[in-house]
Amino acid sequence: AEAGLPKAEAAIIGEPSMMECVTGHKGSGAFSFRIRGFEVHSSLMHTGVSAIHEAARLIEWANERNAENRAKTPSPMAAIFNPPWTTMHVGQISGGTAHNITAGECRFVMEMRLVPDDDPEVLTAALRAKIAEIEAEMQKVAPSARIIAAKGHDVPGLVPEEDGPAEQLVRRITGDNADHVVSYGTEAGHFQAAGISAVICGPGNIEQAHQADEFISLAQFEAGEAFLSKVVDSLCD
C-alpha cells in the first residue's frame, strides 16, 4: 500500500491438491517443550523428577483431548474435514542420560491441527493450565524442576468462502465444482486473514509428501503447467 501497489484480489496456493479447487484447510500450531527434571539413581526415583515421565503426562493429556474430540458430534463445518475433529500430535521426543537415572531433561514438539470451529486460544489456555499443574507437582519434589514451552508456528485455518474471487477463477479454469477441504496447512489462511480471497490448487497428492521417495507424477506436473498458462491468459483478457 505504501508503494502505491493495488491490493491483490485473489491468491492461489499451489500446494498438492491433485489440481482440485480446495476451499478450506485446518489451522495449525506447535509448541516446543523443554522439561527440566532432577536426576537421581532410579532406585531412589521418588526423590527425583523424571523429565521423560512428566513429558509422558503432557503427551497423555494430548491423547485424552484427541479421544474427547473424536467422540464429539462434528459441526457441519468440521464434518467436511478428514478427520472431522481437532488433533494433537507429538512427532519428536528425546531425553535422558541412562536407564538407571531419572531423566534430567526431555525435549519434544507438540503440534495441533484445528477444525475452524475450535478456538486456538482456548486450546492453548487449556494446555498452559495443564503445564502449570504438572510443574507445580514437579517442584514439590525438586524446586528447580521446570517446564519451558515455546510457541512455534501458528497457521490460521482457511475457511470456505461463498463464491470468492479466487474460488470463481479456479473453478472456471479447472471445471471443478465439487467441495474439497484438506487437513494440512498452507499460506492460504494468512492471505484470507489479510482480506484476500484464497484457495488451494496445485499438482501432486499430499499422500506422497514427506516420504523418502516424494514425487509429483508427470501427468500432474503437466496439468499444473497448463493451469498456470490458463491463469495467465485469463488475467490478460
Question: Predicted segments — roles?
Answer:
Residues 32-237:
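Metal-dependent amide/peptide-bond hydrolase catalytic core
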Residues 1-30, 236-237:
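Acidic/histidine-rich catalytic neighborhood of metal-dependent amide-processing enzymes
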